[in-house]
């Protein structure tokens, strides 16, 4: 595989306070850019010393206002896991709360109100209990939706994934299971989804497989009927290792950009193509371009999350060497499709 090196973007630091700053979620609205992230002492998801913070930018990510403590509940590890906007353009964030001994997870949905207060508007009781609920998107005739997956990463053969649907801007939710009883090797995790028109939803998901070869490739998920039925197939994207994808769809050009961080190699990669070029052709993704660089420490960098502001793509990720990791973003003009 040949890599195309674009002019590398220079990351801007959002947060570098002492500690393990990680797992950012990034969302723009018409007035600002909001980055939600968590900070603890190490790469853990169930210790009570991991709290939830935010910073706001009003100049497209060039500078950031003072850190906001969103939540610091001592009994929970709080981690942002998804983002989006409601029908009125208000910013929403999914947050997972975790406790140890035994591990337990619950999910809350925050809304950023006009007074720039983060308010919990939903805490759905879900079964199966997801490990993660990912980014929000609208599907016509259906409502505000998000994909989820459930696993304990122990390969018991009972993993599952599905959809959540809200018809009241996130206050209440309906849970649908798309596939259940899956081994971990067949589970699409941390999916990123976009509605691309004509009832079609395109999603790309991470694989937990680290065996190399054809099994270690991103998943492609497709629905042609607004989420009623789905297909799941492996892509040709194999330069991944526990790499969380994030998608941006441009309806004016019909292009989709797939950003992900190649852990261990320290590269933020992007593949951009027309939706029709990969629809029902998951092995037709073009070669990637290297967009930015970061730490090569395997667990201490990654987890991209992207948003759009005007003609720019903005992508957040974390990078560093434990016990110190930082939140950074890069900004770039929307790329043209590659062949």
Residue ranges and their predicted role:
Residues 1-339:
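Asp-box/BNR beta-propeller blade signature and adjacent active/binding-site loops
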């Amino acid at each position: 595989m040949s890599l195309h090196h674009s002019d590398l973007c220079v990351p801007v630091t959002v947060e570098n306070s002492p500690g393990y700053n990680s797992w950012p979620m990034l969302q723009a609205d018409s007035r600002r850019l909001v980055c939600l992230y968590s900070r603890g002492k190490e790469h853990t998801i169930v210790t009570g010393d991991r709290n939830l913070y935010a910073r706001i930018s009003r100049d497209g990510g060039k500078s950031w206002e003072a850190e906001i403590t969103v939540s610091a509940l001592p009994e929970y590890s709080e981690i942002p896991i998804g983002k989006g906007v409601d029908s009125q353009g208000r910013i929403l964030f999914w947050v997972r709360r975790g406790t140890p001994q035994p591990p337990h997870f619950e999910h809350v949905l925050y809304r950023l109100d006009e007074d720039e207060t983060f308010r919990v508007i939903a805490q759905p009781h879900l079964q199966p209990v997801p490990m993660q609920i990912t980014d929000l998107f609208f599907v016509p005739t259906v409502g505000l939706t998000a994909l989820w997956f459930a696993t304990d990463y122990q390969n018991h053969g009972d993993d599952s994934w599905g959809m959540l649907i809200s018809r009241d801007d996130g206050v209440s939710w309906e849970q649908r299971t798309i596939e259940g009883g899956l081994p971990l090797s067949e589970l699409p995790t941390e999916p990123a989804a976009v509605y691309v028109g004509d009832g079609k939803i395109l999603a790309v998901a991470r694989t937990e497989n680290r065996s190399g070869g054809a099994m270690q490739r991103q998943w492609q998920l497709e629905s042609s009927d607004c989420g009623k039925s789905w297909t799941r197939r492996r892509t040709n994207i194999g330069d991944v290792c526990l790499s969380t994808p994030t998608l941006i769809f441009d309806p004016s050009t019909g292009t989709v950009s797939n950003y992900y961080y190649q852990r261990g190699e320290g590269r933020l990669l992007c593949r951009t193509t027309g939706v029709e070029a990969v629809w029902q052709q998951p092995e037709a993704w073009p070669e990637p371009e290297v967009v930015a660089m970061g730490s090569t420490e395997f667990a201490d960098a990654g987890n991209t999350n992207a948003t759009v502001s005007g003609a720019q793509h903005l992508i957040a990720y974390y990078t560093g060497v434990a016990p110190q990791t930082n939140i950074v973003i890069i900004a770039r003009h929307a790329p043209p499709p590659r062949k």
